């Protein structure tokens, strides 16, 4: 089997990807048997290509799965931890914009009664 490109895999459905994954795993086991029995050098060098292909297929499966989960949870109140933005612990606990801008009644009254003075500079 030739080297598989990730862009070719992205258009396929999940069932097709799983079928291809099984085929690659079967091929890898056959190549490993050939390695033990003393197979040709071309088969030995093919083991690396097949392993990388398996990794590519799994990567595409996982990425599409995560993408679908992101679409599903978009706009929902709660999201799984791995879909939330990765921030530091302190940043997660910080007040949000709305909470930062809230003012007490006393502070609102003070600002209303004593507005900021504006000065005109005489040239």
Curated annotation (Swiss-Prot):
GO terms for cellular component: cytoplasm; cytosol; cytosolic large ribosomal subunit; cytosolic ribosome; membrane; nucleolus. Coiled coil: none annotated. Signal peptide: none annotated. There is a cross-link at residue 25 (Glycyl lysine isopeptide (Lys-Gly) (interchain with G-Cter in SUMO2)). The keyword Phosphoprotein applies. The keyword Kinase does not apply. One of its GO terms (biological process) is cytoplasmic translation. Gene3D superfamilies: 1.10.287.310, 6.10.250.3450. Residues 86-96 have a biased composition (Basic residues). The modification Phosphoserine is found at residue 29. PROSITE patterns: RIBOSOMAL_L29. The modification N6-acetyllysine is found at residues 19, 43. Belongs to the universal ribosomal protein uL29 family. Component of the large ribosomal subunit. The ribosome is a large ribonucleoprotein complex responsible for the synthesis of proteins in the cell. This is Large ribosomal subunit protein uL29.
């Amino acid at each position: 089997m030739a080297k598989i490109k990730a862009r070719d895999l992205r258009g396929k459905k999940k069932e097709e990807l799983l079928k291809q994954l099984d085929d690659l795993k079967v091929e890898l086991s056959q190549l490993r048997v050939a390695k033990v029995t003393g197979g040709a050098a071309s088969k030995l060098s093919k083991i690396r290509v097949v392993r990388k292909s398996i990794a590519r297929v799994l990567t595409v499966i996982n990425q599409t799965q995560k993408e679908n989960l992101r679409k599903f949870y978009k706009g929902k109140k709660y999201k799984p931890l791995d879909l939330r933005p990765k921030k530091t612990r302190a940043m997660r606990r910080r007040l949000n914009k709305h909470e930062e801008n809230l003012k007490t009644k006393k502070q609102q009254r003070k600002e209303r009664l004593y507005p900021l003075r504006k000065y005109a500079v005489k040239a």
